[in-house]
A protein has these predicted regions:
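Low-acidity, Ser/Thr- and Arg-rich intrinsically disordered low-complexity segments
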Residues: 1-47, 56-61
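Catalytic cores and adjacent flexible loops of soluble metabolic enzymes
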Residues: 45, 55-361
């Protein structure tokens, strides 16, 4: 039984629904056969990522159920020299059902969201009591038996779309919906480890948003982390409400994931940056002045002002008026209403007109 586990955490302070619409979700990923549950538990308790509610762990096991002995690599072999998927996953992925149950229990105890990607039908049955929703890997978007099995649980589904075209996405969505999936989040993904910035094609999120307005969108990121965590921030601004990123304790560890993953420093940097972005975005609301603009609104806008001294009873024309700051008098938006009106008293040049200065029409 193969399970490629994801541990996700909601960065919002409260989860009101399993629906992803109100939550910012983050996947972190790591795998190494030398890890054991006690060391992972310690990591979850003590690491900085645990403090912000993100679990830094994911494994796959039993390569024989999803990769033939003749399956070639699809990662950067200059970073991970193993050229066979079967050999790589046999070498590094070692957790089974007991370990996943223990991890799920530990996550529940520490209020960390546990979710896993099943890679075979039996894994769906094993995971179903442990998770609130399922993640389907890009590689299985064309695997109808697995899609149907996951959808039949009735739980929300995160569907990755790496290396897929629109026809394949449509087909997968049709299968999921017909088999019982009600809530689906579609993930943009480039199935290339690592993904160069010019190949990330975050603009595809715009196309996916236009094609599937009824779906929630996400982004599974395989670019190398940078100081600004640009890819994740950009995807979020383009509408991705679910973000997925590989995580490791040590980028030098062997395997096809560590060398392009984020570490604890990257994750904390991302948290800081996304907090700043959320501050910049503010709440979604109709365009209107905010409290700190009131003084500027008053003093930086213009009023109708006299260009010369005028005697009481003078009938105003274009030549008598100019728009000047501040905006404490009659607004230039009322220009046409003022033209032709008479002044009610003597007024000096540069006087800011008010309605009291004019006779009634």
């Amino acid at each position: 039984m193969l399970i490629k586990a994801l541990l996700l955490a909601f960065m919002s302070s409260k989860i009101t629904s399993i629906s992803f619409a109100t939550s910012f979700i983050f996947k972190v990923y790591s795998k190494c056969a030398s890890f054991r549950v006690p060391s992972v538990s310690k990591l979850l308790r003590e690491s900085g990522v645990a403090k912000i509610g993100v679990a830094p762990f994911s494994l796959a096991s039993f390569a024989n159920v999803f990769a033939s002995k003749f399956s070639p690599s699809y990662w950067d072999t200059s970073k991970e020299p193993t050229t066979s998927q079967y050999e790589l996953f046999t070498k590094y992925d070692a957790f089974g059902e007991a370990e996943y149950k223990e991890l799920a229990a530990h996550c529940k105890k520490h209020e960390i969201e546990f979710v896993s990607t099943p890679f075979d039908l039996g894994a769906v049955d094993m995971l179903n009591p442990l998770v609130r929703y399922f993640k389907i890997a890009s590689a299985d978007i064309t695997n109808p038996p697995l899609l149907k099995k996951v959808a039949a649980t009735g739980k929300p589904v995160i569907l990755s779309s790496g290396a897929s075209n629109i026809e394949e996405i449509d087909a997968a969505l049709t299968i999921l919906r017909s088999a019982g999936a009600k809530e689906i989040c579609l993930m943009h993904c480039i199935l290339n480890y690592p993904t160069r910035n010019e190949n990330a094609h975050l603009g595809m999120l715009i196309d996916l948003r236009n094609r599937y307005p009824e779906l929630l969108l996400g982004y599974s990121d395989h670019t190398l982390p940078n100081e600004q965590m640009t890819s994740l921030i950009s995807a979020h601004l383009l509408g991705a409400v679910v973000l997925e990123k590989h995580f490791t304790l040590d980028k030098t560890l062997p395997g096809n994931d560590h060398y392009h993953a984020m570490d604890e420093k990257d994750l904390l940097r991302f948290q800081k940056n996304v907090k700043q972005v959320h501050e910049l975005l503010g709440p979604s609301r109709a365009k209107a002045p905010i409290a700190t603009e009131e003084i500027s609104r008053l003093n930086a806008r213009r009023s109708i002002v006299l260009t010369r001294d005028l005697k009481s009873g003078h009938k105003l024309s274009e030549h008598d008026l100019i728009a000047k700051r501040p905006g404490t008098g009659i607004s230039p938006m009322n220009w046409d209403e003022v033209i032709g009106r008479s002044v009610s008293r003597d007024l000096p040049e540069d006087h800011i007109l008010t309605w009291d200065d004019l006779t009634k029409p």
